[in-house]
Amino acid sequence: MKKALIVFGGWEGHEPKLCTEIFAPLLRERGYDVTLSDTLDIYLNQEFLQGLNLIVPLWTMGTITKEQEKGLLTAVAGGVGLAGWHGGMADAFRNNTEYQWMVGGQWVAHPGNIIDYEVNIIDHEDPITAGLSDFKMHSEQYYMHVDPSNQVLATTTFSGEHAHWVNGVVMPVVWKRMWDKGRVFYSSLGHVARDFDVPEAKEIQIRGMMWASR
């Protein structure tokens, strides 16, 4: 049986427990033995981590020790998949640049806060986005600093209404990448649990998890 770990905590505004309750059952339905952890100390147990197929980080605006960070980075570099979303993965540890390098991006702004915007699928061949069309979100439109080595699957375009100087900027929303031997998947969607009521947002996330899992 494949094994997945969901590590949830940090800022409660991103509803980590509610989001865990969405995706843990979806992983179990796909044959995963899912472990839930509400402590970053789980990253200190390298023997346990190396037995995993997938890690789902769901921890916003936290503080991670160098030892905990090294444990996570080492596990993913060794081949354990990493797949997450929104601030739970890309606004997790603002002082840890190597972690951000692994993720492939870091949140910096969401102009206008909760707004209507469109997500545009740009790769219709990749299994994560195949068969999906552009769709609308009513949530935070993440403005991010991103790694040019990411394989971008979906984007969004900023209107400039809430920050005129970024009018027309095309920003990655969904990407995948490698961290040594480990597959890394990220989606900036999912500010709160109800964002996954949008079928495409949920489908992209679960497909991304399946792709990342070794």
Language-model features: where?
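Structural detector of well-ordered beta-strand residues that form the stable sheet scaffold
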Residues: G81-A83, L153, F185
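Residue-level signal for short, function-critical loop segments
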Residues: F8-W11, G190
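A glycine-rich, often tryptophan-bearing local segment used as a flexible ligand/cofactor-contacting loop or short
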Residues: G62-G131
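Extracellular ligand-binding/catalytic regions of CAZymes and related secreted enzymes
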Residues: M1-K3, E29-R30, E47, H162-M171, ...
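Extracytoplasmic/secreted proteins, especially bacterial periplasmic and envelope-associated proteins
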Residues: L18, I22, G71, P127, ...
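Oxidoreductase and adenylate-handling cofactor-binding alpha/beta cores
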Residues: Y99-Q106, F135-Q151, G190, A201-R214
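Helical hinge/lid and interdomain linker segments adjacent to catalytic or ligand-binding clefts
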Residues: K3-I6, E15-A90
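Catalytic beta-strand/loop cores that center a nucleophilic Ser/Cys/Thr
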Residues: L27-R28, T35, Q50-G51, N113-K181
